[in-house]
């Protein structure tokens, strides 16, 4: 870089120089790197108007320093109304209008603004934000249709004598999926979401058709209701019967099938009820015995704290040990800080006899 600049200085006059000497360059030519690096301040000595006008003449900011040169070329951002510096030198200045137009066209064609949004983008956003009137009309029509069908379903159900739970069970018989009474109630009250209403509508429509055409649907629904009730049946035993079962369990915790049938006949219960009760009672006894054994093991292990025995806090005053242990002793309190002299408990006289006695 230094060699190039030295060679340029040898053939280029310094700023403010004449350049008319022998062997000097022509008055209309100057090296761009030398011109960039030797621009004078405004009002000072610089390149004369006969050679090339400087940046101060045009009112432009100074170009970057020489170390920003890339490949021997000085880079300046294209300015509107100013012609670019040709790489070989400046031969003739271009008019401002033509130069400005050329720069604008080159800048627009070479480096378009990447941040500029396309012209059609706002239109697309507006189209997305604005709802389609046809779709809104279709949704409103579907909502009205669902409202009318919900009213029809409720009227048909009440007329045929079905409950909401019966409708759910019948759907399970017809389509293999049982719906709860809450779901049917929310459908009739239009409390389900629009999506769930649309999913449930075809199934209920088929139920309405089957209810009109199939006379045995009521019987099928009753049979399914009995099956579901048997599955969910919860047995309740009276206290008197439970007491008799408890006494029999103490005598024989695991009765045979004959004994179970005999007990069921005596108490007026079903065999399965008696059998299940004895099974549950044995499991309960196992759990209680395991809990008791765990508690005994914990007590036998003792305190988890290491060290000597931990004394329990007792009432203040002297406490005596067992006879023959070594005389009376005092139970250690939790606090190791001695009492003040003014608050010491009154001393109690102790008579050493065969057995410890409290003094009056």
From Swiss-Prot:
Disordered: annotated segments: 1-48, 86-137, 287-322
GO biological process terms, semicolon-separated: regulation of transcription by RNA polymerase II
Binding site for DNA: 157, 164
GO molecular function annotation: DNA-binding transcription factor activity, RNA polymerase II-specific; RNA polymerase II cis-regulatory region sequence-specific DNA binding
Crosslink position(s): Glycyl lysine isopeptide (Lys-Gly) (interchain with G-Cter in SUMO): 123
Motif (9aaTAD): 4-12
Main location: cytoplasm
Cross-referenced Pfam families: Homeodomain, Pou
Keyword DNA-binding found: yes
DNA-binding region (UniProt annotation): 230-289
Function text: Transcription factor that binds to the octamer motif (5'-ATTTGCAT-3'). Forms a trimeric complex with SOX2 or SOX15 on DNA and controls the expression of a number of genes involved in embryonic development such as YES1, FGF4, UTF1 and ZFP206. Critical for early embryogenesis and for embryonic stem cell pluripotency.
Subunit structure: Interacts with PKM. Interacts with WWP2. Interacts with UBE2I and ZSCAN10. Interacts with PCGF1. Interacts with ESRRB; recruits ESRRB near the POU5F1-SOX2 element in the NANOG proximal promoter; the interaction is DNA independent. Interacts with MAPK8 and MAPK9; the interaction allows MAPK8 and MAPK9 to phosphorylate POU5F1 on Ser-355. Interacts (when phosphorylated on Ser-355) with FBXW8. Interacts with FBXW4. Interacts with SOX2 and SOX15; binds synergistically with either SOX2 or SOX15 to DNA. Interacts with DDX56.
Entry protein name: POU domain, class 5, transcription factor 1
Source organism (scientific name): Bos taurus
